[in-house]
A protein has these predicted regions:
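Membrane-interface extramembranous regions at the lipid-water interface
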Residues: 1-37, 85-100, 146-160
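Hydrophobic alpha-helical transmembrane segments of integral membrane proteins
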Residues: 35, 104-105, 133
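Membrane-helix interface segments in multi-pass membrane proteins
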Residues: 38-79, 110-144
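Mid-length scaffold segments of soluble, non-membrane domains
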Residues: 78-86
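Central hydrophobic cores of alpha-helical transmembrane segments
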Residues: 102-111
Length: 160
């Protein structure tokens, strides 16, 4: 099948104008997932190095500095992928005729980012936020992501 042209990539990811069918949305969304998956994997491998206790370790630990430098670059990549996903999904929402395509396209990312933030925050404030309070964020993210996957990846669009 080969790589898409730069014009096709620009159409899919750089603006929310236009329409795409479900097959194009599925392929492009899987491409975004394949692009960010290695970044997530490296982030998970470096996560233990972000725990830094000055009572037990020196002020500067090279692996901790590397882990935080990576997290900064990962945040940049994650935002670019999120913007690309919103633009791609807005095109698909427009194709199936749902109102407010940008708002609906942003909803799954909001739910996933809130769930990730809850997972990050909970261990740091465990005395005031029990572990069970993270689960509603997870449930909301799964429900919204499942609904979005169905609507954009499998629901029929307008006939061409």
């Amino acid at each position: 099948m080969g790589w898409p042209s730069s014009e096709r990539i620009r159409f899919l990811f750089r603006a929310d104008q236009g329409r795409v069918d479900r097959d194009v949305w599925r392929r492009a969304a899987l491409g975004l997932l394949a692009f960010i998956a290695p970044f997530i994997g490296v982030g998970l491998l470096l996560a233990p190095y972000t725990e830094h206790d000055l009572a037990n370790s020196p002020l500067f630990v090279p692996m901790t500095a590397l882990a935080y430098a990576y997290l900064i670059s990962f945040a940049f990549v994650a935002m670019l992928v999120a913007i690309s996903f919103v633009n791609l999904s807005a095109k698909r929402f427009r194709d199936i005729g749902l109102p407010a395509p940008l708002g609906l396209a942003s909803l799954p990312l909001l739910a996933v980012f809130l769930a990730a933030a809850a997972h990050w925050l909970q261990p740091r404030i465990a005395e005031v936020m029990p572990r069970w309070q993270v689960y509603p964020f997870d449930a909301a993210a799964v429900i919204v992501a499942g609904w979005t996957l169905y609507q954009l990846g499998f629901a029929p669009g307008r006939e061409k």
